[in-house]
């Protein structure tokens, strides 16, 4: 079957992309690594020895960056519905995060450890229909926030990919109840046409200080 013009254009854009070329040169698995690196350069959210959870981790770009920054004394638990080639000292849990069984596996891996940072680059498969895509995206955001509320230590941080649209304002309001400081980030490595942004919430107050966000 011949490739469509749209498919051809996407491939050309992909391989002409400077961040794709940089990832190949620097040994990163995806251009997404540079989104996290840019946020890290500005906000210093990852430090040696931290315990971190990486949601939507495959193919592993964010996990590569995080693992290097937390070092040998740190701990990284990564999860994705897709397979991910192993990374030294990274615990990987494959499965659908919307299923309770996968949540329980992540919680079991965390154990009694208090987590310093939860990062999420999760996104649903996009149909191009906002009425379909936004509820799916917000559902993943709610589940990630629920996990963060369960595992973060007081003062911990939360970084998540979001798409502004129906449901975002309520979500943003919920997060502001749970964290001391909430900011939006749009890394230069995020494609211009993409509606994605990253919400950075710092200084977790603990569930006792705000309404709990229930898992759907």
UniProtKB/Swiss-Prot annotation:
The active site is at 161 (proton acceptor). The keyword Electron transport does not apply. Keywords: Cytoplasm, Methyltransferase, rRNA processing, S-adenosyl-L-methionine, Transferase. Its EC number is 2.1.1.166. The keyword rRNA processing applies. GO terms for molecular function: rRNA (uridine-2'-O-)-methyltransferase activity. GO terms for cellular component: cytoplasm. Specifically methylates the uridine in position 2552 of 23S rRNA at the 2'-O position of the ribose in the fully assembled 50S ribosomal subunit. This is Ribosomal RNA large subunit methyltransferase E. It comes from Pseudomonas syringae pv. tomato (strain ATCC BAA-871 / DC3000). The gene is rlmE.
